[in-house]
Amino acid sequence: KQLKLLFQLYERYDSAISTSDIYDELSERLLEELDYRREAMNMQLYQHMLADEKKVQVPSHIPELSTNRLLTMNWLEGQRLMVFLDTNPDQATRNEIAKTMFRVWYVPFYYYGVIHGDPHLGNYSIAKDHSINLMDFGSIRLFRPQFVAGVIELYKALRDNNRDQAVDAYERWGFVGLDNEAIDVLNMWAEFIYAPLLENRVRPIQQMRGGKAGRDLAGKVHTELKRIGGIKPPREFVLTDRAAVGLGSVFMHLGAEVNWHELFHELIDDFSVDALAER
């Protein structure tokens, strides 16, 4: 009720975003955060999805020490990111951690249609061998194969400057009733989010996401959304955007200098909607 009231107050003050689907999505995810049986199953799911990833550890659920109100798992030794960065790791180490984080988040998404929707700094740690300990499996989202295909399709649309393909991608995501002005604003946002992936070269992510340029673009998108009467983001959009922005922040903390385009293509080049649906 409090969350709904906050969203209602926000919409009265700011018409840029219609929050009804955002409220429905976050309400459902927050309730799932309290379902420890579900979180234990999510943990097992991530152990399966990341079984071939050598640089990540997922804790194991200990059922005999767990109840509906208590979730117990084995201990994973590691340092929080900011503590680790205080040790002044070299650039190569920072880059390797960033690459691992990218795969930890997006192998499940592109191969299984699943995303960890909460990449804040408390939900993973860095082990001594610089692998990742992934934690907190309460905010896990399953996506339609067509939605995942739409994420890839939008990348190709931006790369090829194909407006019709971008519109098709937004519709796969669940946007409805988009006019030309709304599409222009969404493309402005998308070019910002996808920027690290579009050029096949090593780039520090802070060149594209940080500082005044990022703030100016966010302000411009917000202003334009208000001018055109706002948009209504579909439910599935919420956690994918949250994950992308959250990971971008992690990569900026790391000061990562990586070929993001290459990493992305390692995951999508063999993508098949049918294969994803079968998995």
Task: Pin down the residues of each PLM region.
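Hydrophobic "anchor" residues on beta-strands that sit immediately upstream
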Residues: 70, 116, 132
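Short, surface-exposed helix-loop/turn micro-motifs enriched in polar/charged residues
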Residues: 14-18, 38, 53, 116-118, ...
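Helix-rich C-lobe and terminal helical cap/extension of kinase-like folds
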Residues: 24, 67, 76-78, 83-100, ...
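Flexible, glycine/threonine-enriched loop-and-boundary segments that flank and lead into catalytic domains
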Residues: 103-110
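Hydrophobic residue at the +6 position relative to the catalytic HRD Asp in the kinase catalytic loop
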Residues: 122-126
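Residue-level signature of catalytic and energy-coupling elements of molecular machines
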Residues: 39, 72, 120, 136, ...
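Catalytic-loop of the protein kinase fold
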Residues: 111-121
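Conserved ATP-binding subdomain of kinase catalytic cores across diverse folds
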Residues: 1-82, 96, 100, 112
